[in-house]
Structure formats: C-alpha cells, structure tokens
Curated annotation (Swiss-Prot):
Organism taxonomic ancestry: Eukaryota, Metazoa, Chordata, Craniata, Vertebrata
Organism encoding this protein: Xenopus laevis
Assigned keywords, A-Z: Cytoplasmic vesicle, Membrane, Synapse, Transmembrane, Transmembrane helix, Transport
Region (Disordered): 519-548
CC per GO annotation: membrane; synaptic vesicle membrane
Protein name: Synaptic vesicle 2-related protein
Membrane topology recorded in Swiss-Prot or TrEMBL: Multi-pass membrane protein
GO molecular function, one term: transmembrane transporter activity
C-alpha cells in the first residue's frame, strides 16, 4: 500500500471529469494540487484533465495502469530475426520493381529494330508503363489503408506477375502496349512494401533499414542488365520478360509468411490481431513484450485524400509531389539517356548528327552491343555508392538536407555532359549523376512514410509514387524525342528540374530525423504518457500483466 501511495505522489496531478461536465470550474484558478477523491459512487469518465488544462483520452483515465502502444512495443522488441526475414521478402518485391523498370531501356531499342517502330511509338511503349503506374499508385495506397498493407501488396505483385509473363507472348505492337500498361498498373502497388516494412522498424534503425532495402533495387537493376547480356543475343526479348518475373514468382510463393502491420490492425480496431502480431515478433526476436495493456489508438477514417490536404499536411504534400516528380523524371530520364548516349558514342556525336543536313530516318536503328550493355552495367552499379553516401549522411544532416544535396550534385553532374568528352569520361559523369539521383530517391522513400500518420501513410506514399510516375511518363519524350532536336536542351531540362527540387526539399516544413512514426493525425497521447513513469518497457513478460 505504501508503494502505491509513493507512486501516486510522483504522478502528474490530474482531475477526473464526469461525462458532460464542463472542463472549466471555479477551482481552476486555485493553485496547488487537487485531491483525487475515490468513493463508492461509480462515475463514467470520458477524460482526464492535466494541470495545464489539457484533456487526455479516457483510455488513460487510470494513471496507475501499465499501458503501451504499438510504437512502444516495436521500440522495446527492437530489430532482430523477424525484421531480417521481412527485409528479404519485401526486398524481392522491390527487386522485381527495379527489373521491370530497367527492362524498359533494354526492350525499347530491341523492338525499335525488330518491329521497325518510329521513335514516338518507342517512347509510348515506355510511357504506357508509367501511365499504368500513375493510374494505380493512389488506388493501391487506398487499398492498403482500407484493407491492409499485406493485402494491397500481395494483390499488386500477383497482378504484375501474371501480366508480366503474358506480355512475353504479345504477337504485335498493340498487344504489348496494352499488356505492359497492365504491368505498370500492378507495379504501382509495389512501393507499399516500404510502408509495411517501415511500420515494423524501431526508430533508431528505420532510416538505415529502408535505405538498405534499396540494395534490392540496385541488385534488381544489375541483375536485369546481366540477364540481358546473356539472354538477348541467344533467346531474345520474350525470354528476358519471362525470366525477369522470377523475383515476383518467388515472392508469390513465400508471401504466406508476410504478416499484417500491427499499426494498421490497431487503427482498424483489431486489437487482438495486433497484439498477436507483436507477440509473434517478440518470440522470433527473443525479446520481451512490454508489460500492461495494448492501447488502441483513436479510430479514424483511413485512406481519405482530403487528409493529405489538411492544414498540417497541405504544404508537405504539395512539395513532396514535386520532389517525387523530379526524382522519377530525372532518374528514368538518365536511364534512357544513358542508352542513347552510349549508342552515339558521346555528346558531340549526337550534336553533330543533329546539325547534319541529311535528314534522319525515324526507322533507323542500332541494336545494343555487348559494349553498350557493359557500359550500362557500370552506370547501374552506381546505385551502390549512391546508397552508401545517402546512408552515411541521412542521420547526420537529416532527410531534407540529404535530398537537397543529392539534387544539387546531380544537377552539376548533368551539366558536365555539355563537355565534349570521350566514352570513358562520359561513363564517369553518368555514374556520378546516377549515384546521386538514386540517393535522392532513396531519401524520399525514407522521409515520406515517416512524415504521414498511419491513417494516411499508405495513401500518402501512393500519391507521391503516382506523381513520380507522371514524371516518368513524360521523361521518354525528353530523353528520346527531344534528344533528336537538342542534347543540350535535354540536359538543361533535367538539371533545372532538380535545382527546383533541391529548393523544395529545403522548404519542407517537417524534419523527420529522430521522430517516431505517428499513429494518428491527432496528438499522440500514448507516447507522451510513456515518459510519465507509467510505462514499463523491457520487463520480463507476464501473463498477468499483459493483455491476452
């Protein structure tokens, strides 16, 4: 009894308010502590009022109870075996996304020659994939917020696998145009793997882990180029499409293990499922669960686009849309531009060809050579140093400055393409540019899930991904069509766009470095109460203390 009284003396002074009772009273101006009278009368409490007059939700009405939220459990359990498995599984989906994107720069010149396609049809073949992604990104985000992250991810991956294999059997241009568009529709949901992944990560390792999962993207691009080197000269592009679907097939087989996000379960009212998921993670990691009861967050409408434009997120949403647009516009533009530059030999060769009086036939083509594939591989390998640089600076200078630095260095590297240099120096310039634009993309993937609350996290990431696809949709007409008119204007467009993106990064109103994931768009009472001495993390699990 004495211990209980000792604990109560050290708790914040609170006043209990009855249902319907005004929060203002005549005693508000009286200084000193308010006594808590406990009598036999049962009174329904709707809130607790702290000394500063702030109201706490009724689930915290008893300050002596041990309670915890999902964020507290994730922090207590930490990073372990479960997260390593999740990294590998969601990484497969990420790797497949990269391969489907990388295949565009390989497939387009091949079909240009084999089917004698004009340049605008080649550009359209690339753009239709991004049209599908743009149309579906917000939809998959809404599905993930409404029905669960796992559900949205599984459906999108199976969809992509089906139409990806089917497109290998396309007999004519119109068929492959439609089927690749449907592939793009499915790929629009793959970024939700980042949402699912981030919601299982403790705060101190979240940025590093999300960046490290980007290794699968880099591996996917490298694997696609290596696959093309061996498959294209012998088996052709149809087999390349089939073999490129292998990571998706492996994911579809293993996805039965994939758990639903505990944060999503709590927000949707499935407290028991969320608790079961947390216990599963604790068991696999060999870590104790926090003592007490799992607090259910206030249930909110999920997946509502209007929430992205609430006063607290309106500026963030608009700036992020432009940042994601610029990232994809420049990244995929550089991928396509690399192929064009390697085929020409250098920038000056392209410039001289444009000045020639002899008109250029739009059906003229050149197949990619082994040397072209090798140089493409070298620039693709730049994803790794770009990832390492971002990994090193993102927790030192913050997410916003990291994105700004990457955009500025990319812009400078792109301007170096104005110089008339040989193939080797050109490869170095492209290597640096690709390293930093991919680093900026990776930083955006860290920042976006961190800045939005659970109720709109998947939708926020989905709409940003959709805006990225708008940039990717436009970029073939810059990197492939405008290039025929002016290489210098093409490079200037990409460089200027990223300078503006760097400015936008600096003006983002929220820095998420060292910030926990927000469960709600409202004030996070669970996290505040933890610091008041009522939370017991890391204690030995107790059946009597934990909610079953």
């Amino acid at each position: 009894m004495e211990d209980d009284l000792f604990q109560l003396r050290h708790l914040p002074v609170v006043k209990f308010r009855r249902t319907g009772e005004s929060s203002k009273s005549e005693d508000d101006n009286i200084s000193g502590e308010h006594e808590i009278q406990i009598g036999p009368v049962q009174t329904e409490l709707e809130a607790v009022e702290l000394e500063d007059g702030t109201t706490v939700p009724k689930e915290f009405a008893n300050p002596t109870d041990d309670t915890f939220m999902v964020e507290d459990a994730v922090e207590a359990i930490g990073f372990g075996k479960f997260q390593w498995k999740l990294s590998m599984l969601t990484g497969l989906a990420w790797m497949a996304d990269a391969m489907e994107m990388m295949i565009l720069s390989i497939l387009a010149p091949q079909l240009h020659c084999e089917w004698r396609l004009p340049s605008w049809q080649v550009a359209l073949l690339t753009s239709v994939v991004f049209i599908g992604m743009m149309a579906s990104s917000s939809l998959w985000g809404n599905v993930s917020d409404q029905y669960g992250r796992r559900t949205g991810l599984k459906i999108s991956v199976i969809w992509t696998l089906y139409y990806g294999i089917l497109s290998a059997f396309a007999p004519v241009y119109s068929w492959i145009l439609v089927l690749r568009g449907l592939v793009g529709f499915g790929i629009g949901g793959v970024p939700q793997s980042v949402t699912l992944y981030a919601e299982f990560l403790p705060m101190k390792s979240r940025a590093k882990c999300i960046l490290l999962i980007e290794i699968f993207w880099a591996l996917g691009t490298v694997f696609e180029v290596l696959l093309a080197i061996f498959v294209m000269p012998t088996l052709g592009w149809r087999w390349l499409l089939i073999l490129s679907a292998l990571p998706l097939m492996l994911f579809a087989i293993l996805c039965f293990w994939l758990p639903e996000s505990a944060r999503y379960e709590v927000l949707s009212g499935n407290q028991e499922k969320a608790l079961a998921t947390l216990k599963r993670i604790a068991t696999e990691n060999g870590a104790p669960m926090p003592l007490g009861k799992l607090i259910v967050s206030r249930q909110e409408d999920r997946g509502k686009i209007r929430d992205l434009f609430s006063p607290q997120f309106r500026c963030t949403t608009l700036l992020l849309w432009f940042i994601w647009f610029s990232n994809a516009f420049s990244y995929y533009g550089l991928v396509l531009l690399t192929t064009e530059l390697f085929q020409a030999g250098d920038v000056c060769s392209i410039s001289n060809q444009r000045k020639a009086v002899k008109p250029k036939c739009s059906l003229a083509c050149e197949y990619l050579t082994v040397e072209d594939y090798t140089d493409l591989l070298w620039t693709t390998l730049s994803e790794f140093p770009g990832l390492l640089v971002t990994l090193w600076i993102i927790d030192r200078v913050g997410r916003k400055k990291t994105m700004a630095i990457c955009f500025i260095i990319f812009s400078f590297s792109a301007l170096l393409l104005f110089l008339c240099v040989g193939r080797n120096v050109l490869t170095v310039f492209l290597f640096i540019a690709r390293a930093f634009i991919s680093g900026g993309f990776q930083a955006a993937y860290v920042y976006t899930p961190e800045v939005y609350p659970t109720a709109t996290r998947a939708l926020g990431l989905g709409t940003c991904s959709g805006m990225a696809r708008v940039g990717a949709l436009i970029t073939p007409f810059i990197a492939q069509v405008m290039l025929e008119s002016s290489i210098y204007l093409t490079v200037l467009v990409y460089s200027g766009c990223c300078v503006l993106a760097a400015v936008a990064s600096c003006f983002l109103p929220i820095e998420t470095k060292g910030r926990g994931l927000q469960e709600s768009s409202h004030r996070e009472w669970g996290q505040e109460m933890v610091g008041r001495g009522t939370h017991n993390v890391g204690a030995t699990p107790s059946h009597s203390g934990s909610q079953e």
